[in-house]
UniProtKB/Swiss-Prot annotation:
Record-annotated disulphide pairs: none
Region described as Involved in Mg(2+) ion dislocation from EF-Tu: 81-84
Region described as Disordered: 218-282
Gene name linked to the record: tsf
Record protein name field: Elongation factor Ts
Basic residues bias: start-end ranges: 273-282
InterPro entries membership: EF-Ts_dimer_sf, Transl_elong_EFTs/EF1B, Transl_elong_EFTs/EF1B_dimer, Transl_elong_Ts_CS, UBA-like_sf
Superkingdom of the source species: Bacteria
Compartments reported by the entry: Cytoplasm
CDD domains: UBA_EF-Ts
Length: 282
């Protein structure tokens, strides 16, 4: 429904809530002023805008390490007094904000107004160059691009993220609720998000070379490996007959001088004749 700007202004003057919060309250209540005030009080938004202009120089710097130690967050949240800084509700708020940052990969800035103009122009150039807009008329293209840029800027802004524990409110509304509850201005000043190994170019390790290096060996050169792989297999050697053992040496038979009329004595086969013995027939 359409909300009259005069009603929004009146509600703002009565509650001190922000213009957009007042408009949303009137939309939720159907334009009823009393119901809108009740809605703002239930959300903790009444009076938050007045406190938002006050200086917040106290606070805490807190950290959050996600399970597995792969994501870490540092965040600074300010309040007006050290009394509130020690309050358990304030500490819980800071811890919830740190967890929110850890869960949001795209978040880079606290709020949209902190995004540099060059980043906005870069996003605009990216959207204008997309092929699906090439055939659109110029005025239509501008509206589409503007809508996409606003969506993209909200993705970069922490305060515009839906709260991870209650998606019906944003982080900004969560902070405003605590401003109303604790009675002091609260401001998320800055944060840093760390991801293990982010920005490091990993090199593919040669597992064989790594093992060889640990063993103190030199890894085989690729050329040598290729040469060995290309070499034809050795031909099998034909079985050679076993060498016969050397024959037992046999002493030569002695030569016996015999007379002309003597008949030679028969020698036993395979045995040498007796050395130096000769007999004559009578």
């Amino acid at each position: 429904m359409s909300i009259d700007a005069k009603l929004v202004k009146e509600l703002r003057e009565k509650t001190g809530a922000g213009m957009m919060d007042c408009k949303k309250a009137l939309e939720e209540s159907g334009g009823d002023m009393e119901k809108a005030i009740t809605w703002l009080r239930q959300k903790g938004l009444a009076g938050a805008a007045k406190k938002a202009s006050r200086v917040a120089a106290e606070g805490v710097v807190d950290s959050y390490i996600h399970f597995g130690n792969r994501i870490g967050v540092l965040v600074e949240v300010n309040c007006e007094t050290d009394f509130v800084a020690r309050n358990e509700d304030f500490k819980k708020l800071v811890q919830d904000i740190a967890k929110q940052i850890a869960a949001c990969q795209s978040v880079e800035y606290v709020s949209i107004d902190q995004i540099p103009p060059e980043v906005v122009e870069r996003e605009r150039a990216i959207e204008m160059g997309k092929e699906d807009l090439a055939s659109k008329p110029e005025n239509v293209r501008e509206k589409i691009v503007q809508g996409r840029i606003e969506k993209r800027l909200k993705e970069l802004s922490l305060m515009d993220q839906p709260f991870i524990k209650d998606s019906s409110i944003t982080v900004e509304e969560l902070v405003k609720q605590h401003i109303a509850k604790l009675g002091e201005n609260i401001r998320v000043r800055r944060f840093a998000r760390f991801v293990l190994g982010e920005g490091i170019e990993k090199q593919e390790a040669d597992f064989a070379a790594e093992v060889a290096a640990q063993a103190g060996l030199k890894p085989a050169q690729p050329a040598q490996v290729a040469e060995v792989a290309a070499a034809p297999p050795a031909e099998p050697v034909a079985d050679q007959p076993a060498a016969e053992p050397p024959a037992e040496s046999v002493a030569p038979e002695p030569v016996v001088a015999e007379s002309a009329d003597a008949e030679p004595a028969p020698a036993a086969e395979g045995k040498p004749s007796k050395k130096g013995s000769t007999k004559k027939k009578k």
